[in-house]
Amino acid sequence: MPIKNIATFFFLIFALSGCTSLYDTFVYQIDVTQGNYIEDEKLDQILLGMSQEQVIFILGSPMLIDQFDSSKWYYIRYIKPGGEPIQQDKVVFTFDNLLLTDIAREGTIDINPLIKTPKARNVPNAATEDPSTSDNPQTDNDTPVIVN
């Protein structure tokens, strides 16, 4: 009888160990990035009327070309940073006679959440502000640093 109780106890321990919510807090989860890296600078270079070859030269190959309508190209970027919510950015290019006619963008990615950017310094505008009243006073040897 005690062996049956011990076996039941271990069975319950192993069965209930799969029902834990500690997975998200204690287990390391890698950052997952898939798809095309869509930079605003490169997207600003795309103009209506460009050919498909010019778009490929600037942004690279699209993630998806619609099977039923080959005039639509999808550039999709998917990010899942660790245990945080999934973010997705999508840009759809529509072509007519091999020329770009429409650009549609939707998504939740503002900046790359996987890259930690340093805080930008407040550099006073010499024409409108007095440098001595800024957050970071400069001496004659300091050069203003602008962080992208």
UniProtKB/Swiss-Prot annotation:
Please tell me where this protein is predominantly located: membrane
Query: GO CC terms for this protein?
Result: Bam protein complex
Taxonomic placement: Bacteria, Pseudomonadati, Pseudomonadota, Gammaproteobacteria, Alteromonadales
Q: Where is the lipid attached (S-diacylglycerol cysteine)?
A: 19
A Gene Ontology molecular function term for this protein is:
protein-macromolecule adaptor activity
Q: Where is this region: Disordered?
A: 120-148
Per the similarity annotation, which family is this?
Belongs to the BamE family.
* Subcellular localization, as worded in the UniProt entry: Cell outer membrane
* Keyword Lipid biosynthesis appears in the UniProt entry: no
Q: Which organism is it from?
A: Psychromonas ingrahamii (strain DSM 17664 / CCUG 51855 / 37)
An example of a Pfam family matching this protein is: BamE
- Protein name per UniProt: Outer membrane protein assembly factor BamE
The domain of life for this entry's organism is Bacteria
Q: What exactly does this protein do?
A: Part of the outer membrane protein assembly complex, which is involved in assembly and insertion of beta-barrel proteins into the outer membrane.
Q: What residues show lipidation of type N-palmitoyl cysteine?
A: 19
Q: How does it sit in the membrane?
A: Lipid-anchor
The record's note on quaternary structure and interaction partners says:
Part of the Bam complex.
> Is Lipoprotein included in the keywords of this UniProt record?
yes
Q: Keywords, A to Z?
A: Cell outer membrane, Lipoprotein, Membrane, Palmitate, Signal
| Polar residues bias locations | 130-142
Could you say which residues form the signal peptide?
1-18
The cross-references to InterPro entries, in alphabetical order and at most eight, read:
BamE, BamE-like, BamE_dom
**What are the GO BP annotations of this UniProt entry?**
Gram-negative-bacterium-type cell outer membrane assembly; protein insertion into membrane
